[in-house]
Amino acid sequence: MIDDLIVYQKTYDFMLWLHPVVNKFPKSQRFVLGQRIENKTLDLIHSMASANIEREKSALLKQASVELDELRMLIRLSKDLRFVSIKQYGVAAEKLNEIGKLLFSWMKKFS
């Protein structure tokens, strides 16, 4: 079951943490960069859920890895544009690094 996957749970928890942060973006960016960040996080969750049920997991896990890298870049851009604080960026980076380690471990099982 997908809820049993720690990496899925951590990504879901990241989305719960992220939502109020994105809602504080400037109004002009909330529905541009903010929405893109939330959508990318949801894409990552979707890729993990799909990989969990598919027989051929490798391609979906690689897709999840790319989505994670894109998400890291979008969070960094948000920091550089000062939409998130250094502290929020640090929390996000820590959470994304943990997700990345868990995802890499999962990928190693199927490569």
What function would you assign to each model-found segment?
Residues 1-111:
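Amphipathic alpha-helical assembly/interaction segments
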